[in-house]
């Protein structure tokens, strides 16, 4: 008899298990998550016809990946004014707006604003 719809035996766990299941990886997947183990077996002889020598080497490699939103670069330090302030990386001037809303603008000459004081226009 077939399985009921939506029931999973845990062998081929869906990556969307957090939506349809417990959200926890199976114990076998949790034990191996983030690491890779490689075992190499080498058999050699000393050339005189003696007993073969078997050597086994096991290597464990850490495969941790950085999740989204986790700061991984030492240059990405916390900035109280936001991530795009200052010339910390590009050595260019800031594009931060310095005039108050409704206040003076350096673009008044384009939009017919008041002329700067002392310009001689009356």
Swiss-Prot record:
The modification Phosphoserine is found at residue 73. Residues 32-61 have a biased composition (Low complexity). Keywords: Microtubule, Phosphoprotein. It comes from the Eukaryota. One of its GO terms (biological process) is cortical microtubule organization. Residues 1-78, 96-122 are annotated as: Disordered. This is Protein SPIRAL1-like 3. It comes from Arabidopsis thaliana (Mouse-ear cress).
């Amino acid at each position: 008899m077939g399985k009921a719809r939506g029931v999973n035996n845990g062998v081929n766990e869906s990556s969307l298990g957090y939506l349809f299941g417990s959200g926890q990886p199976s114990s076998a997947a949790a034990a191996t998550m983030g690491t890779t183990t490689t075992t190499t077996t080498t058999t050699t002889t000393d050339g005189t016809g003696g007993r073969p020598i078997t050597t086994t080497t096991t290597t464990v490699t850490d495969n941790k990946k950085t999740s989204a939103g986790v700061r991984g670069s030492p240059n990405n330090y916390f900035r109280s004014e936001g991530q795009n302030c200052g010339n910390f990386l590009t050595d260019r001037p800031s594009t931060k707006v310095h005039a108050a809303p409704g206040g003076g603008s350096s673009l008044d000459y384009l939009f017919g604003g008041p002329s700067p004081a002392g310009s001689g226009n009356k």
